[in-house]
A protein has these predicted regions:
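Bacterial N-terminal signal peptides
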Residues: 9-22
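N-terminal secretory signal peptides that target proteins for export/translocation
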Residues: 1-7
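Cellulosome-associated attachment modules in secreted, modular CAZymes
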Residues: 310-314, 343, 350-412
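Conserved "turn/edge" positions that cap or connect secondary-structure elements
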Residues: 23-354
Length: 412
């Protein structure tokens, strides 16, 4: 806890802090392309400091990238001439996963850390594979690997234990994993269809239900493994983004655009408690996909509309690939009009903190409700405290309490 209750003699100094407290703005950062033709972002660390993805050359060769502190760098060392793609990063930002061409020309699953470099994860009797997601600390990695018969099999790789097939029927891919590595999601691919699954060590593979159509895919999972998002088809081939709150029950259709505006959408990212979902939809009258954010209160919103003020004239966002568990940081790709190319982006959606005079609940009256709100939050620190951080100094302390006390009764 920062500070302590002050003496009345220090009130002037405390109130002065009210005037110089910082405020923070929402930002859209185009990440660059490694001087190549284009780039896409595929994942982001929990604190938004690390972004990974793929950069494409003019000949559409591809290189995995790692972006941190405003700088994009290739994953593999310069001597590496093969292709590479980064699909996931651990929550702590220390482990990157994807696939990379090995010395004999096969694309194989890898993990990479800044300290140890590249480590190949092996296969399941075959030669190829791809790692798609990692647990919070990177000790558990999931994806697909080739079997001896060249089928793709969903796997879970664990530090010290190696790669394990999940036992999903037919061709299968693991697309996501919970923060502790205990819950895995993905899909199986019998001829002509996709069928989503959820896996745990206790229950094995458990198939998820959809809306009666041919294809169901699970694409993202909350850190605790309780909520899954993806898409499901209807019999008329309409595809809607959806949310599974219970793996034994049908999903919730979260597509709130009218069919005349869009009949196709997929969910690709979900926040910590499953109340914010990101993905993309395809406008009925358009060519390119557009990103959406869904909440129970507002339904689907086009990010190009919500964050229009951050987009330069002619720029647009195409898709969302991932977001941080608190919903603050969003990554994907779009068209950067300034450079004239498709680029990976990092969107920081943090609402600016605005210092105020003590009306915490904004009801026009500074009263006991405002005072109690600050008292109950007293000692909390962080960037997203809300209006209880009256002076926006990232700490609820005596300065905030005194601001409310000085204004007590105003507007009532």
């Amino acid at each position: 806890m920062k500070g302590r209750l002050c003496t009345w003699g220090s009130m002037t100094a405390l109130m002065g802090a009210f005037c110089v407290a910082p405020c923070f703005a929402q930002t859209l950062t185009w990440l660059g392309t490694l001087d190549y033709r284009s780039s896409i972002a595929t994942d982001v660390s929990d604190d938004g400091s690390v972004v990974v993805g793929i950069a494409y050359t003019p000949n559409y060769d591809f290189r995995a990238f790692y972006w941190r502190n405003g700088r994009m760098e290739p994953i593999a060392p310069p001597r590496w001439l093969g292709w590479s793609q980064a699909y996931g990063v651990s929550g702590d930002g220390n482990v990157v996963v994807g696939n990379m061409m090995d010395s004999v020309g096969y694309m194989v699953a890898f993990k990479w850390t800044p300290s140890a470099g590249v480590e190949f994860l092996g296969a399941l009797g075959g030669v190829g594979g791809t790692a798609l997601a990692a647990s919070y600390d990177g000790s558990t990695i999931v994806g697909w690997a080739e079997a001896r018969n060249e089928d793709r099999l969903a796997f879970r790789w664990r530090q010290g234990q190696g790669m394990q097939a999940l036992g999903a029927p037919a061709t299968s891919v693991a697309t996501g994993v919970s923060a502790d590595g205990s819950v895995v999601i993905g899909y199986v691919n019998p001829p002509g269809v996709l069928l989503a699954f959820r896996w745990t060590e206790a229950e094995g593979v458990r198939m998820l239900t959809g809306f009666g159509g041919s294809n169901i895919a699970a694409q993202a999972i909350t850190p605790d493994g309780s909520v899954i998002v993806g898409y499901a088809d209807y019999p008329d081939h309409t595809r809607h983004a959806c949310r599974w709150l219970d793996p034994s029950q049908p999903p919730q259709d979260i597509h709130t655009f009218s069919d005349s505006d869009s009949s196709q959408s997929t969910a690709t990212a979900v926040n910590r408690d499953g109340t914010i979902i990101m993905g993309q939809y395809w406008p009925s009258s358009g060519v390119f996909s557009r990103p959406f954010r869904w909440t129970p209160q507002r339904g689907m919103e086009d990010l190009n509309t919500v964050y229009a003020g951050l987009l330069t004239n002619g720029s647009s966002l195409f898709n969302v690939a991932a977001m941080s568990p608190d919903g603050r940081f969003i990554v994907g790709s779009g068209f950067n009009a300034r450079t004239g190319r498709r680029e990976a982006f990092l969107l920081d959606t943090r609402v600016p903190c605005r210092a105020h005079s003590g009306d915490v609940d904004e009801n026009g009256c500074v009263d006991d409700a405002d005072l109690l709100a600050v008292l109950f939050a007293f000692g909390q620190t962080g960037q997203d405290l809300g209006r209880v951080d009256v002076n926006c100094d990232e700490t609820v302390d005596d300065a905030d309490l005194l601001t409310v006390l000085f204004a007590f009764g105003q507007g009532c």
